[in-house]
Structures are given as C-alpha cells and as structure tokens.
C-alpha cells in the first residue's frame, strides 16, 4: 500500500517537494535516508514518487510550485535533510525541468 510508505517526514500534501528532493539526490548516488529501500521493493523509487505526485495533482487543490523559476539549489533542501536526520549529497548546479 503506497499510502503507508513514510515519505521522509513529509505529508502527502507536499508531493512536489518530495519529487524535487529525489530528483536532486537519487540520480547522482545512493540515497541514504531514514527508511529502508525494501519499502520500494515493488516499485522503482523515482517512478513511485512521480506516480504519487501525479495523483495529487488531480486533487481539488493543485500542489504549490515551490520553485516557479524552474531551478533547484542545494540550499532548498536544508530543511528536508534536517527533518530526516540524514546527510544527503546534492549537486550544486540548478536542475532544470
């Protein structure tokens, strides 16, 4: 049940933040966060996060676009890393999408 998977301490009302977080950390190197990779055994991590985000976009209130300029910097993730208690490397350059 995907709804039972803890999304690094964020509620499912913030799928955009979660998706951006994984876009930053996951493709570069293994992601060490506060939950076991076994939680994603039935589904690839990236696909699962994107699927949850697309489901949320269909809701009555669309998710807030946190970065309207389309750029993402390491400093945007300080709070997320602190909430999980994990140190997750992130590329310094902005990510375009």
UniProtKB/Swiss-Prot annotation:
Reported function: Accessory subunit of the DNA polymerase that acts to increase the processivity of polymerization.
Domain of life: Viruses
Protein's name according to its UniProt entry: DNA polymerase processivity factor
Keywords annotated in UniProt: DNA replication, DNA-binding
Chain positions covered by the region annotation Disordered: 42-68
Bridged cysteine pairs (disulfide): none
Record GO terms (molecular function): DNA binding
Keyword DNA-binding on entry: yes
Record family assignment: Belongs to the herpesviridae polymerase accessory protein family.
Lineage: Viruses, Duplodnaviria, Heunggongvirae, Peploviricota, Herviviricetes
Gene Ontology BP, a term: DNA replication
